[in-house]
Swiss-Prot record:
GO biological process: action potential; cardiac muscle cell action potential; cellular response to hypoxia; locomotor rhythm; membrane repolarization; muscle contraction; neuronal action potential; potassium ion transmembrane transport
Organism field: Mus musculus (Mouse)
Domain of life: Eukaryota
Important for normal channel activation and inactivation, for interaction with KCNIP2, and probably other family members as well, as annotated region: 474-630
GO molecular function: A-type (transient outward) potassium channel activity; metal ion binding; voltage-gated monoatomic ion channel activity involved in regulation of postsynaptic membrane potential; voltage-gated potassium channel activity
Localisation per UniProt entry: Cell membrane; Cell projection, Dendrite; Synapse; Perikaryon
GO cellular component, one term: perikaryon
InterPro entries linked: BTB/POZ_dom, Ion_trans_dom, K_chnl_volt-dep_Kv, K_chnl_volt-dep_Kv4, K_chnl_volt-dep_Kv4.2, K_chnl_volt-dep_Kv4_C, Shal-type_N, SKP1/BTB/POZ_sf
The protein's name in its UniProt record: A-type voltage-gated potassium channel KCND2
Length: 630
């Protein structure tokens, strides 16, 4: 027997650790051909230079996606025998892991927009994200959607009015963003002042102000000084009425505006006044009017337009509507249950105030909210026990949705703070750019007007002085860019003030060729980097600009372009500021307006140029194209 055990024991041990099966048959041959076939199915995915290797069968598990279908062959490169994708390799790691494990995860450190773009490119839907990451993904996506909506609203109610905006759109923009104009800001503060005055008057008119002659009882201030309070209320209601009518007239959608909460508050705030004007002196009718006057207190909600904190609180309550609904439903159930229990528990007591189940509602509400007024208390032992349970259950029911509400309030508050910070940074950045460009353009136009550029071009010894006067590197490059635009195009830069004062006149003159130093042949910092084109020698007649106009240089914002028949003209730019001999009136009733923005100046490059230049065209007239915002 021992010999038999010794014969099969090694096989049992080998089978236990997975070396060989228990069967006594011969071991099968290794799958050499299958392994070779599997190695041939190993594919390489090159994602922006990062190589990933996986099996073809792994990708073909999901044939409805890009990598699992034959569409990936469009990205195959036979030279490298790789599939190349110009995408984000960091996010692609998580996408490839989905093919390997069948679970898609969301990397919390990645941008939600970039992640959605990668999923859409590879044909994956966000709904397959694992449960461990799906809630985080939904929260980040909701925050991003709210941020984009906030940015869109900011762009729509931006500080700069678009030229295509109608008067109605401008009025609505002024109401929604009062800081766009001075008048809108003044009206904003005036309405806020009258809201405060109306609320204070509504409170003060109930304060006793002493007894009047013939009355023993003290009269409230609203009755003793009825005329003064009526005039004050009339002034407030007139302001509120004008504001409501203007908002209604300027609203993009009047139907949506009328149905909005703030519109209903505005109507409720002013409606009691107009009802009181048409009321009779009948005491029964006036009693109903006194009841309506309580709605004047709703004017305090008009402060929500002037308070960011109130708006955030409103957004929080709106976003927590489901949690608040759950809280109300839970409290209602608990109130009904405990009121019924307390009624039957106290039914046997003669001194009990629990006369009915509706009467017990007051006790359960006060107890569950942990107020405890003490006007109704249980007398029996059973009533005290159930009252204690009611108090503890109220604490639990109310405390459950509170963290959710606080979390939503904190999220909305910080999101609003970030949006304000982004708007402030954007405003400061645009202000710095405008200041830099305006200063550079003003310096350029002033130097042209004073003839400094042409004086500097007369001798090469003065170039260091010109460089020292040019200011910062940004200003130097901006001057160089303006000079290149004047050289390569038939444009001349003039300021807005001179353009308006010139009465839209342009002069043409034929002069012989001159070899005098010109603006186009400047070397050094302002030397050209652009090929020479046919040039014009006309100008807006700004040589006669008075000293006062010279001192107040406007922002460079006008380019005059004349596209007419060409005739030989002098190729010299030395007479840039010379007076014209002939003036031609232009038909400017229908000017063409185009917008252009120059943001990247061209670096200076020194290019030697000779005196042999092609002749420049002569311009006898044509339409003027004003290119603004340069």
């Amino acid at each position: 027997m021992a010999a038999g055990v010794a014969a099969w024991l090694p096989f049992a041990r080998a089978a236990a650790i997975g070396w060989m099966p228990v069967a006594s048959g011969p071991m099968p041959a290794p799958p050499r051909q299958e392994r070779k076939r599997t190695q041939d199915a190993l594919i390489v995915l090159n994602v922006s230079g990062t190589r990933f290797q996986t099996w073809q069968d792994t990708l073909e598990r999901y044939p409805d996606t890009l990598l699992g279908s034959s569409e990936r062959d469009f990205f195959y490169h036979p030279e490298t025998q790789q599939y190349f994708f110009d995408r984000d390799p960091d996010i692609f790691r998580h996408i490839l892991n989905f093919y390997r494990t069948g679970k898609l995860h969301y990397p919390r450190h990645e941008c939600i927009s970039a992640y959605d773009e990668e999923l859409a490119f590879f044909g994956l839907i966000p709904e397959i994200i694992g449960d461990c990451c799906y809630e985080e993904y939904k929260d980040r996506r909701r925050e991003n959607a709210e941020r984009l909506q906030d940015d869109a609203d900011t762009d729509n109610t931006g500080e700069s009015a678009l030229p295509t905006m109608t008067a109605r759109q401008r009025v609505w923009r002024a109401f929604e963003n009062p800081h766009t104009s001075t008048m809108a800001l003044v009206f904003y503060y005036v309405t806020g002042f009258f809201i405060a005055v109306s609320v204070i008057a509504n409170v003060v008119e109930t304060v006793p102000c002493g007894s009047s002659p013939g009355h023993i009882k003290e009269l409230p201030c609203g009755e003793r000084y009825a005329v003064a309070f009526f005039c004050l209320d009339t002034a407030c209601v007139m302001i509120f009425t004008v504001e409501y009518l203007l908002r209604l007239a300027a609203a993009p959608s009047r139907y949506r505006f009328v149905r909005s909460v703030m519109s209903i508050i505005d109507v409720v705030a002013i409606l009691p006044y107009y009802i009181g004007l048409v009321m009779t002196d009948n005491e029964d009718v006036s009693g109903a009017f006194v009841t309506l006057r309580v709605f004047r207190v709703f004017r305090i909600f008009k402060f929500s337009r002037h308070s960011q904190g109130l708006r955030i609180l409103g957004y929080t309550l709106k976003s927590c509507a489901s949690e608040l609904g759950f809280l109300l439903f839970s409290l209602t159930m608990a109130i009904i249950i405990f009121a019924t229990v307390m009624f039957y528990a106290e039914k046997g007591s003669s001194a009990s105030k629990f006369t009915s189940i509706p009467a017990a509602f007051w006790y359960t509400i006060v107890t569950m909210t942990t107020l405890g007024y003490g006007d109704m208390v249980p007398k029996t032992i059973a009533g005290k026990i159930f009252g204690s349970i009611c108090s503890l259950s109220g604490v639990l029911v109310i405390a459950l949705p509170v963290p959710v509400i606080v979390s939503n309030f904190s999220r909305i508050y910080h999101q609003n703070q970030r949006a304000d910070k982004r708007r402030a940074q954007k405003k400061a950045r645009l202000a710095r750019i405008r200041a830099a460009k305006s200063g550079s353009a003003n310096a350029y136009m002033q130097s042209k007007r004073n003839g400094l550029l042409s004086n500097q071009l007369q001798s090469s010894e003065d170039e260091p002085a010109f460089i020292s006067k040019s200011g910062s590197s940004f200003e130097t490059q901006h001057h160089h860019l303006l000079h290149c635009l004047e050289k390569t195009t038939n444009h001349e830069f003039v300021d807005e003030q001179v353009f308006e004062e010139s009465c839209m006149e342009v002069a043409t003159v034929n002069r012989p060729s001159s070899h005098s130093p010109s603006l186009s042949s400047q070397q050094g910092v302002t030397s050209t980097c652009c090929s020479r084109r046919h040039k014009k020698t006309f100008r807006i007649p700004n040589a006669n600009v008075s000293g006062s106009h010279r001192g107040s240089v406007q922002e460079l914002s006008t380019i005059q372009i004349r596209c007419v028949e060409r005739t030989p003209l002098s190729n010299s730019r030395s007479s840039l500021n010379a007076k014209m001999e002939e003036c031609v009136k232009l038909n400017c009733e229908q000017p063409y307006v185009t917008t252009a923005i120059i943001s990247i100046p061209t670096p200076p490059v020194t290019t030697p140029e000779g005196d042999d230049r092609p002749e420049s065209p002569e311009y006898s007239g044509g339409n003027i194209v004003r290119v603004s915002a340069l």
